[in-house]
Amino acid sequence: MKYKIAMNTLVYGPDMNESIIQHLAYIKEVGYDGVEIPIFVTDIDYWTPWKKEIDRLGLEVFTVTFLGADMNTISADANVRQKGIDFLKKAVDITAYLGASYLSGPFHSALAVFSGAAPTQQELDWSKESMLAVADHAQSKNVILGLEYLNRFENYVVSCADQLYALVKAINHPNVKIMFDTFHAHIEEFNTGEAMVRIADEVGHIQLSESTRATLGEGQVRWDNVFDGLSRMNYTGWLVVEAFTPLLPAACIWRKNYTTEAELVKKSYENIQKYLGA
């Protein structure tokens, strides 16, 4: 099966300013069909230059975001939860404005906030309630929320495929699906391909990310296993390359694991084509 492939622009840095827009043409030139853009700014006017260039190039677009402690959607403080909900609704609005249909990320709870214990049922209930509030708004904008699990060093609420699958089933909303990221699966799953097949009916979006967070095919992720799982899950969505620069503190990338961003973008695309047998 032929898949459409997108590149996440975080490879160029965390601030989606106009200096990063210039790289969109190269992403298109390499062969990518779309881009995935992080939403940290919720002023629609900020995104006008992005929309203009995306439309000019004919790229399709997806968005991602995450929450900090001050917007934790499972906080015991209702005001904090509401702040997270309000931010996500604005991110949905930006997503729709850009012409995107998917907003993904680990926003079922906050990034890198820990209680020192496993999640309580109350925390899971708060997550469900928060996601339902955002999902209703997303539905009105024709946007799907793709929830992502993170590895246990970045999140304690959902840190494996089965936990996220259970949460999405509990939320039970047509605009809430799973976004599967191979980086976290490489750490947490016994068999990534089998995990993909097991949760296939709820997977709507897939990120391909190497163990080094750099060039696909140059780390320890078992890509043969990943693409075997992909071939068995009847997935018809997109494949998105996610790689990070040391400029993104939240990713804890303290050294550069690639030569240049341009080479990373190109080699990752070429390696995906090899794995797909294209």
Locations of regions flagged by a protein language model:
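Histidine-acidic metal/acid-base catalytic patches
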Residues: 1-13, 17-28, 158-180, 185-278
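Active-site acidic/histidine proton-transfer and metal-coordination neighborhood
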Residues: 18, 56, 79-177, 259-262
